[in-house]
């Protein structure tokens, strides 16, 4: 069973109850959307691979960079699975050759999606708590709390994806429609919990920036987290709601011309998975409202600085002087 991507046909595609030939506007639109999705996915794979490499091997990690590292891994896995699906559709549309993508990829897609949404929610909620109770947060927080949270979120995502994969027939088991529907409903319920926490976190972070006596200096990490969370709300959550809940209502695919609703939601999910590396580079390159170039490592480091911009510049100068003095 295919839980998210309907099988296209090479020569004829049925849209809104009628068949369209290869030269019809709807088929052309479908091909353009798929090609655009693949291009965005390849850029996203490169960006997330860069973040993974830098955070894993080239930079010292802190509390929040661990979340970013796990988010990059989840986004990379999500883009890998859906790039395979998109390439399959391209081959079918252009060459009339059907290839088989293992059903395991659907389970991997669910795992990556749930893990990515959970990581963004966790980093937003933790940053929110660190701003509300800074002294308690700094004094009582255990050293390996972030690692434990990330492990737990990956474990929960793995459990839900395996249960869904088994009941929906993606793991070589028998398809059970009733259990599959219930598992998808549980996934949607978990997504709604994450959405509620994330929305509250964004609200508090924005209020602390702009309102009254609680106004706080805006740090680059603050901006990075808020932008990443907003992109997830706009581009990421629709994918989960559509493909784990509204999938069971087939009429949902006919609400847009040419049945392009499916491709549109997929395109938004690709944008969400590509957004974090772009946000980090943009936030890291802006200094005093101007773009300043730098190495990828430096830009990523700036994007995760949780200190005001002036203090960050002083810190960079001190580090630079130490590096120069250490050179014989």
From Swiss-Prot:
Q: What GO cellular component term, any one, is given?
A: plasma membrane
Q: Biological process GO terms, please? A: G protein-coupled receptor signaling pathway
Gene3D superfamilies annotated for this entry?
Rhodopsin 7-helix transmembrane proteins
Transmembrane stretches, start-end = 34-54, 63-83, 113-133, 145-165, 179-199, 225-245, 264-284
- Positions in the Extracellular compartment: 1-33, 84-112, 166-178, 246-263
Cited Pfam families: 7tm_1 (PF00001)
Asked if the keyword tRNA processing belongs to this entry, the reply reads no
Subcellular localization, as worded in the UniProt entry: Membrane
Principal place of residence? membrane
Tell me the keywords, alphabetical order: G-protein coupled receptor, Glycoprotein, Membrane, Receptor, Transducer, Transmembrane, Transmembrane helix
Q: Which is one GO molecular function term here? A: G protein-coupled receptor activity
In terms of PROSITE patterns, this protein maps to: G_PROTEIN_RECEP_F1_2 (PS50262)
Q: Which residues are glycosylated?
A: 16
Cytoplasmic domain ranges by topology: 55-62, 134-144, 200-224, 285-328
Supply the PANTHER family for this chain: MAS-RELATED G-PROTEIN COUPLED RECEPTOR, MAS-RELATED G-PROTEIN COUPLED RECEPTOR MEMBER B8
Q: What does this protein do?
A: Orphan receptor. Probably involved in the function of nociceptive neurons. May regulate nociceptor function and/or development, including the sensation or modulation of pain.
The family this protein is said to belong to: Belongs to the G-protein coupled receptor 1 family. Mas subfamily.
UniProt-recorded name of the protein: Mas-related G-protein coupled receptor member B8
Report the source organism. Rattus norvegicus (Rat)
């Amino acid at each position: 069973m295919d839980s998210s991507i309907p099988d296209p046909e090479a020569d004829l595609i049925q849209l809104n109850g009628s068949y369209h030939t290869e030269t019809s506007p709807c088929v052309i639109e479908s091909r353009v959307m798929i090609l655009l999705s693949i291009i965005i996915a390849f850029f996203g794979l490169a960006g997330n691979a860069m973040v993974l490499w830098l955070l894993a091997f080239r930079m010292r990690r802190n509390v929040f960079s661990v979340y970013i590292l796990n988010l990059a891994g989840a986004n990379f896995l999500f883009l890998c699975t859906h790039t395979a699906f998109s390439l399959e559709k391209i081959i079918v549309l252009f060459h009339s050759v059907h290839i088989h993508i293992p059903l395991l990829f659907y389970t991997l897609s669910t795992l990556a999606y749930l893990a990515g949404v959970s990581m963004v929610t966790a980093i937003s909620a933790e940053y929110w708590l660190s701003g509300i109770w800074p002294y308690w947060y700094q004094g009582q927080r255990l050293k390996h709390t972030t690692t434990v949270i990330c492990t737990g979120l990956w474990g929960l995502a793995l459990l839900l994806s395996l249960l869904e994969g088994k009941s929906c027939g993606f793991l070589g088991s028998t398809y059970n429609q009733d259990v599959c529907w219930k598992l998808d409903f549980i996934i949607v319920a978990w997504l709604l919990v994450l959405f509620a926490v994330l929305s509250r976190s964004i609200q508090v972070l924005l209020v602390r920036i702009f309102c009254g006596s609680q106004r706080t200096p805006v740090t680059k990490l603050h901006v990075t987290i808020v932008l990443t969370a907003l992109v997830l709300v706009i581009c990421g959550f629709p994918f989960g709601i559509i493909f784990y809940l509204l999938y069971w209502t087939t009429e949902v695919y006919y609400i847009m011309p040419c049945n392009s609703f499916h491709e549109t939601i997929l395109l938004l999910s690709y944008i969400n998975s590509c957004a974090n590396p772009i946000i980090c580079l943009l936030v890291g390159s802006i200094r005093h409202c101007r773009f300043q170039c730098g190495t990828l490592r430096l830009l990523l480091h700036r994007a995760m600085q949780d200190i005001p911009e002036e203090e960050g510049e002083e810190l960079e100068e001190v580090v630079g002087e130490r590096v120069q003095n250490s050179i014989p």
